[in-house]
């Protein structure tokens, strides 16, 4: 299978292009869920609107969403995980290695792991995140529970299967 990887300039302007790439990949039908790191929920709502008939959206934040955002998410069928414990944040070596690819790569893998830990996903997912108020990273991931990050059995570990979009560094 031949795929193009988008290289997006970090920030809010990247969001539309990323959502289009995620929608296109989602329409292939083999992925049921998109997990997004969304601090205030606004980018999750944009994704939810675009993916309404394509895939379920799960939004993860370490904070709490406003009541208005929660209402909008509920209308779109978005599952919200608030006050999430971010499992990569406390693993310095892993965190710093992933940050070489950009904050969105770390955050994408982190929220995929949170969704797996909470039992919200089955099978492979699209994991989405970004920086500077926008979405610039999308990966197809085999998620795992945080306890399995270093599992000696590779079939139980998280794996990045595809890069759909990455932030252009520098």
For each of these PLM feature ranges, what is it?
Residues 77-83, 88-136:
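Long, charge-patterned amphipathic alpha-helical coiled-coil/hairpin "stalk" segments used as oligomerization
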Residues 126-170:
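Glycine-rich, aromatic-bearing surface loops/beta-hairpins
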């Amino acid at each position: 299978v031949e795929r193009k990887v988008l290289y997006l300039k970090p920030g809010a302007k990247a969001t539309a292009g990323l959502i289009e790439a995620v929608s296109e990949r989602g329409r292939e039908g083999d992925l049921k869920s998109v997990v997004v790191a969304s601090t205030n929920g606004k980018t999750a709502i944009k994704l939810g609107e675009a993916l309404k008939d394509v895939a379920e959206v799960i939004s993860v934040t370490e904070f709490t969403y406003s009541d208005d955002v929660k209402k909008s998410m509920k209308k779109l069928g978005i599952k919200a995980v608030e006050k999430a414990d971010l499992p990569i944040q406390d693993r310095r070596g892993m965190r710093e290695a992933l940050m070489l690819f950009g904050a969105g790569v770390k955050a994408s893998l982190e929220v995929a792991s949170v969704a797996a830990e909470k039992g919200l996903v089955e099978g492979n997912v699209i994991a989405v995140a970004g920086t500077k108020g926008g979405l610039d990273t999308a990966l197809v991931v085999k998620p795992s529970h945080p306890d399995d990050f270093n599992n000696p059995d590779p079939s139980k570990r998280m794996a990045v299967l595809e890069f759909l979009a990455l932030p252009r560094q520098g």
